């Protein structure tokens, strides 16, 4: 665990606290030194849970589908605490696994009332007690992103929760409240155990479908929630982090992992964490976001290799970080240079623990992009990235991690250039394909997708888009550009043991940019907001974010 995620004394409200994931959430936040308000249904054992935790923790019986209960909860919280720092919306009911034709209307409505309307109601009431810096994390589901038979009500409710996560993130950003979600795959909870006992779920078949070869433990979901609720996720809002072992990265018939004779031990107990210093290589690590990532791993005591086309800057940063860190000048468009680099590192270290695949921002307005320019940019940022991933994978062992740096803007149809959108989309797919391929070997992959970050590259991006700094900030719900260190924190988390079930996922570190569907929404005033956070708006302006 990263000690910097621990902010003792925060008041954390956890709904659905008495069951699987909820109990793991309670345990993790309480261990952090936070004050936990555990909320669940009557007769769920939540009162006893609160009593066992002891003062100042609290257990409360609340039915989130009843508006009167939720209003009463807010009144009690207001009386007992001066403020609420974090809400985790975890209350929910699982799928009945009944066919659509056999699903009663009341059952469909009940799923919506608890999983969606209840979560929204609790968020709205609790937000009244929140100050800038507070966070709401919704526990959604992979079912809200992928269709499956016999899950109509459950899937619809979770898809709605993911959508509300985005809209609330935009609405409350001006108040300094972040809203995010996690989307777990299959988790070893009492809910899943009951479905398995009833013969409605074949867990052995699920394991074969997951590249990592197992279902998740509740604490793996709780650790992802803890990160999203922490100060280290300060530029993440509106994002949904998929925690599925790589399920979404597989799109082919048959299994993603070979059948296993016994239940993997990691489903029941968290393996012992290797606390030895890791060997980390950061490609493009000499300046900007890459340099911030290199510094973050170095702070942890890891050995960092800074590889960059700018050898002089790489040497300078390695010198600042300390004697054990290395620098190498590498042109990743030259295959032989990349191969030689990784051969040298394998010989020196034996294996690599983390590879961070940075990129060189090359921005040309769409009107100036010839096929030759497109190819040149792809050679650097996509083909070169592929070569690095290929060689890094050869150098890794079970437990190693590959992180690719992409961009949230690549998902916008108004990308700043054809090449920019193309290579970032390619990077995301490279992450997913390698997650499916390397997951069975115990190697995880993920994409970190920054939005506008305070670097020279961000200034060039704005220039290509034809925007000044005020216009740029208006486009971002949080009302500011991010810092390179905020991207580094996301990368550090994804490479950590706390992210052990995250594989093939993309994490947007963009201040809510990708959740904002039209220009100017992000800086909409909704309550008090400081002048620093709120740039001056231009009346009737509709910014064409990325068109020159």
From Swiss-Prot:
The record's annotation in Pfam families points to: adh_short_C2
Location of region: Short-chain dehydrogenase/reductase 2: 271-548
For substrate, which residues are the binding ones?
141
Top class in the EC scheme: oxidoreductase
* Top-rank lineage group of the source organism: Bacteria
Q: Which PROSITE patterns match?
A: ADH_SHORT
Q: Which GO terms describe its molecular function?
A: oxidoreductase activity, acting on the CH-OH group of donors, NAD or NADP as acceptor
Q: Which residues form the active site?
A: 154 (proton acceptor), 420 (proton acceptor)
UniProt-annotated binding residues for NADP(+)? 12-37, 280-304
Sorted UniProt keywords: Multifunctional enzyme, Oxidoreductase, Plasmid, Repeat
Q: What is this protein called?
A: Uncharacterized short-chain type dehydrogenase/reductase y4vI
Q: Which organism is it from?
A: Sinorhizobium fredii (strain NBRC 101917 / NGR234)
Taxonomic path:
Bacteria, Pseudomonadati, Pseudomonadota, Alphaproteobacteria, Hyphomicrobiales
């Amino acid at each position: 665990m990263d000690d910097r995620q621990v902010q003792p004394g925060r008041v954390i409200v956890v709904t659905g606290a008495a069951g699987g994931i909820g109990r793991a959430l309670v345990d993790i936040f309480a261990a952090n030194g936070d004050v936990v308000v555990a909320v669940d249904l009557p007769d769920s054992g939540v009162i006893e849970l609160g009593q066992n935790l002891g003062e100042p923790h609290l257990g409360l019986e609340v039915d989130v589908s009843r508006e009167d209960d939720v209003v009463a909860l807010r009144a009690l919280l207001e009386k007992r605490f001066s403020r609420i720092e974090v809400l985790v919306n975890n209350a929910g009911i699982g799928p009945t696994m009944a066919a659509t034709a056999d699903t009663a209307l009341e059952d469909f409505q009940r799923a919506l009332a608890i999983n969606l309307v209840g979560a929204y109601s609790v968020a709205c009431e609790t937000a009244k007690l929140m100050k800038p810096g507070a966070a709401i994390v919704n526990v959604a589901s992979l079912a809200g992103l992928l269709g499956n038979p016999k899950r109509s009500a459950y899937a619809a409710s979770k898809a709605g929760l993911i959508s509300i996560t985005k809209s609330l993130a935009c609405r409350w950003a001006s108040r300094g409240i972040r809203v995010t979600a996690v989307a777990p795959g299959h988790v070893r909870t009492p809910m899943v155990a009951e479905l398995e006992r009833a013969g409605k779920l074949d867990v052995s078949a699920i394991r074969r479908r997951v590249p990592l070869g197992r279902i998740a433990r509740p604490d793996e979901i709780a650790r992802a929630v803890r990160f999203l609720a922490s100060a280290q996720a300060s530029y993440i809002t509106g994002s949904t982090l998929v925690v599925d072992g790589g399920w979404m990265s597989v799109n082919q018939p048959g299994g993603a992992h070979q059948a296993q004779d016994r239940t993997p031990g990691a489903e029941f107990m968290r393996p012992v964490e290797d606390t030895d210093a890791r060997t980390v290589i950061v490609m493009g690590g000499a300046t900007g976001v890459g340099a911030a990532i290199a510094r973050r791993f170095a702070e942890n005591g890891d050995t960092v290799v800074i590889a960059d086309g700018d050898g002089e800057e790489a040497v300078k940063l390695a010198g600042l970080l300390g004697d054990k860190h290395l620098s190498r000048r590498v042109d990743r468009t030259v295959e032989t240079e990349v191969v030689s680099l990784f051969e040298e590192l394998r010989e020196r270290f034996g294996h690599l623990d983390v590879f961070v695949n940075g990129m060189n921002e090359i921005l040309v307005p769409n009107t100036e992009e010839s096929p030759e320019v497109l190819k040149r940019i792809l050679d650097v940022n996509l083909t070169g990235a592929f070569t690095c991933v290929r060689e890094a994978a050869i150098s890794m062992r079970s437990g190693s991690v590959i992180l690719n740096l992409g961009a949230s803007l690549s998902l916008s149809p108004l990308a700043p250039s054809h090449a920019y959108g193309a290579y970032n989309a390619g990077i995301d797919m490279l992450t997913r394909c390698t997650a499916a391929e390397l997951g069975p070997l115990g190697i995880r992959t993920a994409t970190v997708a920054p939005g506008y970050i305070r670097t020279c590259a961000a200034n060039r991006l704005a220039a290509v888009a034809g925007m000044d700094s005020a216009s740029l900030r208006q486009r971002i719900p949080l009302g500011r550009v991010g810092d390179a260190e905020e991207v580094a924190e996301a990368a550090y988390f994804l490479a950590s043991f706390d992210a052990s079930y995250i594989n093939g996922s993309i994490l947007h570190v963009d201040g809510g940019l990708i959740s904002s569907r039209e220009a100017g929404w992000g800086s909409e005033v909704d309550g008090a907001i400081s002048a620093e956070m709120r740039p001056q708006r231009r009346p009737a302006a509709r910014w064409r974010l990325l068109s020159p």
